Amino acid sequence: MVKINGESLEIAGRTIAQYLATTSYDIRRIAIECNGEIVPKAVYETTILQDGDIVEVVSF
């Protein structure tokens, strides 16, 4: 399970980009933190979410 904004989801093994494709977030207007670290947009395609990750998505 991956916890995103407090909600547990069965998305371990997917990339951040794959997760975002299932949402209505505007990728140009978000910031993502994974386990306390800001994730650069340049690595959304290659960052694989792992079981136990805690992710915060902030839109602005």
Region spans (language model):
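Ubiquitin-like/PB1-type beta-grasp interaction modules and other compact soluble beta-rich domains
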Residues: 1-60
